[in-house]
Structure formats: structure tokens, C-alpha cells
Amino acid sequence: MLTVLGDEDLISLKSGSACIDAPLAIIGPGTGFGAAALVPSQNTWITMPGEGGHAAFAPTTELERELLTLLSQKYQHVSVETLLCGRGLVDIYQALCQ
């Protein structure tokens, strides 16, 4: 469970100070792209699963736009999950090698 992980088990995406009673985002690539929220409630935490992987990939840099162009030749829809899963990480690597 996330609440028993130590600092050495976590990776910070952005520095800052956390609010002890604020919801936490949980994301992770694997066979798909998992996304959930961990929400504090009284003396416990409630897990709220999500479908964040289904969001469309929205490039913001030239490199990301080139990646989208390449992957659009292979996939009809390029979602976050298309990129951030096992197969997608290989696709990103191969695109960067071109």
C-alpha cells in the first residue's frame, strides 16, 4: 500500500511541499497505464481508480509532435496508454532511434 512506502520507494515528479491531508495521484506504466487517486477519509484512505490512460496524447514540443506523427502511422488513436505501457516504451525508443 502506498501509505507504507518509504521515501526511497517514491519518485518525485515536481518539488514542493505536500499537504498531509491532500489526495495523492498514483500512476504507473505496465501492460497498460494505471492511474488512480488516493483520497484521505477520516482515519483511512480511499482508492479511486481512473482511466487516465485513455486520454489522447497531447504533444507540446516539436519532438513530441514528431513522435505523434510516427506513431499515428502505426495506431489509429495515440493515447497516453499507447505510449506509457510496455509496448509503448519500446515504440518511443524505436522512434527516437530513427
Predicted regions and their residues:
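Phosphate-binding/catalytic loop of phosphoryl-transfer enzymes
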Residues: 1-83, 90, 97
